[in-house]
């Protein structure tokens, strides 16, 4: 049995308003067994001293794309094997940055490479966060997940349908849902609205009818699988919430009424603010957009004010926010930047940290994670300083423990 004593840090348990001083955490055989003042190290235990650090639960990112990169075209014309190989260092870097759990919400290949990556991590073949996976974005033809119009001229791979997981009408949608679940999906994701990165639609356009959304959610629910939609505007939110989704991805154009509907339904919002609001902040900066498609900049110019207003409304609401980044739309391993973006737009540091720990665990149905308490799985990270007063230190994680195994530790003090 492996035993580790973590001592000398302030401990924030994932729930409280403040961290506690002078508290030690004992980990035995992958689980937290004691959280107390001044624990005496058991014989044979490794002692990790963390002066000046804050110890927290491992972070969870509820919206990643580990096989996708900012220039999505390169992923679309790569083989599933190439995409999986490119994801290996991404997974390692995510873990070393303190993200011990991720929910991956779409690969850009028609196969199921992210399910294979999930299983490889679970078996210990690959170092990385534990993964929950929605393999593809089920999308209406011509919607956000139909890439036919994006790279048709560059398409080279035989048998690589650019429609990926396109489905229209209740019957075809049910079939597509069942195919995802048959392959091993933990979640089902669908496109409720258009998006910013797709050239043929608009973020406020609703791409599935109420009947189609209801058929999709019911097909997944019958098989015990939760559903989440890519969704920006009010009408998409209204239809998705009515259909019975578990969370809303993005929601960055939702007005106060739509946010209240999310709150009243008791579901979660994953606002992916770094990728969206960073673009909005630079909507009229020509240099910032020099290497990006013109249509994408035009969309952010059109919606800049509304995006910033929605962020303000969200901060003032009581919506249950879960942390998610849309990483892959920006460089991987910079997921921590979501924290300061949330805080810059009115969300308190403790609410942002809960979003990535206890609230994320609730969304993902992972009761053993997200808090530091006896009998919980030992997913623990530490960073110098105090993220409750300086959120930027979330980018300086230097201790990472997943299931009791230390994957990163602070550098030894120089002599």
Regions found by a protein language model. Name each.
Residues 70-73, 114-115, 144-145, 198-199, ...:
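Histidine/acidic-residue-rich catalytic or RNA/ligand-binding cores of hydrolases
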């Amino acid at each position: 049995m492996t035993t580790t004593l973590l001592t000398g840090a302030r401990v924030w348990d994932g729930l409280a308003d403040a961290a506690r001083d002078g508290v030690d955490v004992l980990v035995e055989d992958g689980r937290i067994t004691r959280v107390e003042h001044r624990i005496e190290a058991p014989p044979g235990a490794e002692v990790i001293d963390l002066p000046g650090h804050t110890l927290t639960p491992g972070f969870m990112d509820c919206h990643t794309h580990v096989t996708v990169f900012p220039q999505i075209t390169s992923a679309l014309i790569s083989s599933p094997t190439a995409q999986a190989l490119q994801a290996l260092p991404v997974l390692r870097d995510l873990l070393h940055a303190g993200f011990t759990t991720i929910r991956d919400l779409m690969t850009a290949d028609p196969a199921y490479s992210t399910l294979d990556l999930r299983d490889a991590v679970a078996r210990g073949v690959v170092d990385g966060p534990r993964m929950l996976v929605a393999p593809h974005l089920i999308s209406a033809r011509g919607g956000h997940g139909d890439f036919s119009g994006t790279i048709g001229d560059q398409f080279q791979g035989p048998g690589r349908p650019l429609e990926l997981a396109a489905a229209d009408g209740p019957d075809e949608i049910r079939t597509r849902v069942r195919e995802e679940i048959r392959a091993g999906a933990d979640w089902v994701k669908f496109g409720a609205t258009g998006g910013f990165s797709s050239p043929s639609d608009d973020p406020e356009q609703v791409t599935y009818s109420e009947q189609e959304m209801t058929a999709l959610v019911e097909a997944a629910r019958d098989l015990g699988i939760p559903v989440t939609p890519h969704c920006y505007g009010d009408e998409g939110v209204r239809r998705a919430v009515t259909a019975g989704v578990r969370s809303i991805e993005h929601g960055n154009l939702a007005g106060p009424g739509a946010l209240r509907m999310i709150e009243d339904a008791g579901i979660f919002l994953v606002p992916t603010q770094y990728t969206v609001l960073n673009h909005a902040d630079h909507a009229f900066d020509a240099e910032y957009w020099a290497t990006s498609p013109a249509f994408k900049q035009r969309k952010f110019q059109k919606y800049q004010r509304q995006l910033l207003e929605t962020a303000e409304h969200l901060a003032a609401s009581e919506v249950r926010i879960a942390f998610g980044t849309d990483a892959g739309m920006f460089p991987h391993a910079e997921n921590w930047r979501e924290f300061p973006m949330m805080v810059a737009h009115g969300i308190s540091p403790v609410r942002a940290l809960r979003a990535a720990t206890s609230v994320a665990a609730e969304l993902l149905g992972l009761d053993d994670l997200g808090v530091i308490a006896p009998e919980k799985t030992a997913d623990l990270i530490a960073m110098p300083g105090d993220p409750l007063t300086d959120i930027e230190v979330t980018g300086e994680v230097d201790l990472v423990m997943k299931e009791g195994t230390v994957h990163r530790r602070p550098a030894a003090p120089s002599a």
